[in-house]
Amino acid sequence: QQSGDGWVLIGDAYGFIDPIYSSGVYFALKSGELAADAIVEGFARDDLSGTQLGSWTTEFDAGTQWIRKLVDKYYTNEFSFGQFMKKFPHHQGNLTDLLIGRIFYDGAGDIFQDMDPAMDRVLGKIPRD
């Protein structure tokens, strides 16, 4: 539960993201910023319910899902980011965005259109090319 009447979790208390990438502090601050907006709006509406105070999490989760997917790929020994980038160099900018925490925009997860099938191939879930 991320929020309740009169309280809300932010930062690592809301959702820890593996520190393998240096963007963890940014995500903690971003969650605080989004939660602060929900709190200010709650005061303006005289609504400090858990629903109002947690309204920021949908946007946050939509962005951080891409980092969680990237971390999952990182810890899969069979997957090689180097080999993936050689095959799909057009994703270099997207990978850079993910690594620096630029994830709150449409298209942030475009790399996974190719990365997910590549992962499935190395794990033998689908035939190799």
Regions found by a protein language model. Give the residues of each.
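C-terminal helical "tail/cap" subdomain of flavin- and related membrane-associated enzymes
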Residues: V40-D129
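Conserved mid-domain beta->alpha element of the FAD-binding
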Residues: Q1-W66
